[in-house]
């Protein structure tokens, strides 16, 4: 027998939903200087501090975290790092722990970006440990997942992303994704000028949310899923309007105040999701 949901139950479900704030994250990568950063932050503070339903975050190299804390602590712009150690403390030369990031006021940290995974041979297991370290110390992890062009052309992109998620789920459970962020970044789109089509992005974002929801629906509803990979002022509005795209992780364009501002305004102007 086919079950139907009464109008009263539907109304109750709608009342329980809430609007989901958009999230736009600047990933400065290994760029910047004290002077360049100050000029860029001046414009960010002027242009991006008054949004009503978009949170802007700047993730900078470690040496500039104190500068971000000093410049942004009186604004509505949050800040974070681009990596975190998997260890709490100890003889790990060159590493920076989650607790240290908190000392500099960080509230976000990027984890598992494909550039790091490739250049420094970061395994899914190590990325999962870093994810948990971030959560343990009150940082919001921005977990990067995505497939190569070869994997997409072979039609195994969902299998690849599923494996990346399962490493965390199998170790820590799906509940850890509550109030976390996943950034879907097709590796073939990062820094290439090629972006996933809205349909490609929508399909993968829906797959990711359904994957988490099949285990823990509350975590799936609280999870934000960003798109990253050649987001620019020309495609931002179209991408941000897609269901299940909660914002973007922005690389190159975040180094240009006009371009990054245009992307943030596109997020602010896009329809809110309710979950």
Residue ranges of predicted features:
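Active-site loop-to-helix "anion-binding N-cap" substructures in soluble metabolic enzymes
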Residues: 2-183, 187-275
């Amino acid at each position: 027998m086919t079950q139907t949901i009464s109008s009263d139950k539907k109304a109750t479900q709608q009342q329980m939903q809430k609007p989901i704030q958009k999230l736009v994250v600047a990933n400065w990568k290994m760029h910047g200087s004290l002077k360049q950063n100050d000029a860029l932050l001046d414009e960010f503070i002027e242009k991006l501090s008054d949004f009503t339903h978009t949170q802007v975050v700047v993730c900078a190299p470690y040496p500039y975290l104190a500068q971000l804390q000093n410049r942004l602590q009186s604004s509505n712009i949050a800040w974070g790092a681009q990596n975190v150690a998997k260890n709490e403390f100890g003889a790990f030369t060159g590493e920076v722990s989650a607790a240290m990031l908190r000392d500099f006021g960080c509230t976000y940290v990027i984890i598992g970006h494909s550039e790091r995974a490739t250049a420094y041979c970061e395994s899914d297991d190590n990325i999962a440990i870093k994810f948990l370290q971030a959560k343990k110390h009150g940082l919001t992890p921005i977990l990067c997942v995505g497939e190569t062009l070869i994997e997409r052309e072979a039609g195994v992109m969902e299998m690849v992303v599923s494996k990346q998620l399962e490493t965390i789920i199998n170790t820590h459970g799906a509940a850890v994704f509550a109030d976390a962020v996943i950034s879907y970044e097709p590796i073939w789109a990062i820094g290439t000028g090629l972006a996933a089509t809205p349909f490609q992005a929508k399909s993968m974002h829906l797959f990711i949310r359904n994957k988490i929801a099949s285990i823990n629906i509350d975590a799936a509803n609280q999870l934000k899923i960003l798109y990253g990979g050649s987001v620019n002022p020309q495609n931002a509005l179209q991408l941000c309007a897609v269901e299940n795209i909660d914002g973007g992780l922005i690389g190159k364009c975040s180094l240009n105040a006009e371009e990054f501002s245009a992307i943030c305004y596109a997020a602010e102007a896009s329809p809110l999701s309710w979950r």
